Curated annotation (Swiss-Prot):
Induction: By dietary protein, amino acids and medium-chain triacylglycerol.
Family: Belongs to the gastrin/cholecystokinin family.
Pfam families the UniProt entry points to: Gastrin (PF00918)
Signal peptide as annotated in the record: 1-20
Alphabetical keyword list: Amidation, Cleavage on pair of basic residues, Hormone, Secreted, Signal, Sulfation
GO CC terms, sorted: axon; extracellular space
Tissue expression summary: In the small intestine, the major production site is around the vitelline diverticulum.
One BP annotation, GO: digestion
Full protein name: Cholecystokinin
List of residues that carry Sulfotyrosine: Y112, Y126, Y128
Propeptide: 21-48, 122-130
Record note on modification: The precursor is cleaved by proteases to produce a number of active cholecystokinins.
The encoding gene: CCK
Length: 130
């Protein structure tokens, strides 16, 4: 009980002292405080670490020049060609395995390693006498 009262008094003292401080808008003309406030209000851009696939090339900036647009167009065309070729890497193995399954197989959407339909299994294990 005594500990709860001490915590309430401490919180009240902290809230009163924080109300007595300067508002966030006034910085007394300090350039460091103004820079800090500006950095806090700007949206942050988080960058991801490069993947292990290889080094990344810096993307060209769009200044509206014809050469840069042509470069981006060529990169887009190359990407679309690769996308049309199909999947590569780990997904190609999965695609080959799914294609080798009998075409009359009824549960293609649930075929992955380790999947088991427990309802069907339990119904097959127990023979019901009627």
């Amino acid at each position: 009980m005594y500990g709860g009262i001490c915590i309430c008094v401490l919180l009240a003292a902290l809230s009163v002292s924080s109300l007595g401080q300067q508002p966030a808008g006034s910085h007394d003309g300090s350039p460091v405080a103004a820079e800090l406030q500006q950095s806090l209000t700007e949206p942050h851009r988080h960058s991801r670490a490069p993947s292990s696939a290889g080094p990344l090339k810096p993307a060209p900036r769009l200044d509206g020049s014809f050469e840069q647009r042509a470069t981006i167009g060529a990169l887009l065309a190359k990407y679309l060609q690769q996308a049309r070729k199909g999947s590569t890497g780990r997904f190609s193995v999965l695609g080959n395995r799914v294609q080798s399954i009998d075409p009359t197989h009824r549960i293609n959407d649930r075929d992955y390693m380790g999947w088991m339909d427990f309802g069907r299994r339990s119904a097959e294990e127990y023979e019901y006498s009627s």
